[in-house]
Regions:
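Glycine-rich, aromatic-lined ligand/substrate-binding cores of catalytic
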Residues: 183
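Active-site-proximal cap/lid insertion segments
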Residues: 2-29, 35-175, 179, 187-197
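Short, intrinsically disordered, charge-balanced linker/junction segments flanking boundaries
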Residues: 197-205
């Protein structure tokens, strides 16, 4: 994290050593690139695997596009009970930026979903939404992720796949971890999970 700017990240193409940057807010530019890729997949004979790794929301939180920052500039948020009183103002400021980023990401996910539908891929594509960690945002008097409290380690794990879960979906209280993602995806696609894999296949749940 000392060498990588999550709000202005670099990338490389192919074997080139040239460092490139997206022209606008990372999440928006990356989403546009993904949508361009999806346009090539509507009639493709082979399945595809794609990862969109959005860096935001990430400290510093004041880097979302201006229109999203304005949505929350006067917002007063409900603060968790475990935020010390002397950290409340600090938490309010951070949450305004955090939610600005999250709203931008929400729009990006909506754009992706629209493109999947436009290309007829929405019913036969497994969509996974998750995160590597949460942020404490003032809880326990801390800010980022370095301490293993619930605010840091409990993250969403959402799968959209009507073929497996039906049109209304399902909810589970199962405790899933990062090593379980790959075997679960293999299970959903009917591929045998190698015995050497550490994680568990949760697709039957």
């Amino acid at each position: 994290e000392c060498t990588h700017d999550y709000n202005h990240s670099a990338y490389y193409e192919g074997n080139s050593k040239e460092k490139k940057y997206w022209e606008s807010y990372d999440a928006i530019s990356q989403t546009q690139d993904v949508c361009q890729f999806l346009k090539t997949q509507s009639n493709a004979s082979d399945p595809f695997f794609l990862v969109l790794s959005i860096g935001s929301p990430h400290d510093p939180y004041n880097t979302a596009p201006e229109k999203y920052q304005k949505m929350y500039e006067n917002k007063i948020f409900a603060i968790r009970d475990n935020v010390p009183k002397d950290k409340i103002e600090w938490a309010q400021k951070g949450l305004r930026g955090y939610y600005a980023h999250m709203t931008a990401i929400d729009d990006c996910i909506g754009q992706l979903w629209k493109e999947l539908k436009n290309q007829g891929l929405d019913e036969n594509t497994i969509i996974v939404f998750t995160s590597d960690h949460g942020d404490l945002m003032g809880s326990h008097g801390a800010w980022n992720k370095q301490q293993p409290y619930d605010e840091s380690i409990r993250v969403p794990f959402l799968i959209h796949y009507p073929k497996a879960f039906g049109p209304t979906g399902k909810k589970s209280k199962a405790l899933i971890n990062s090593p379980d993602i790959m075997p679960t995806l293999l299970g959903l696609t009917g591929i045998e999970v190698p015995k050497s894999v550490e994680g568990k296949d949760f697709s039957p749940i």
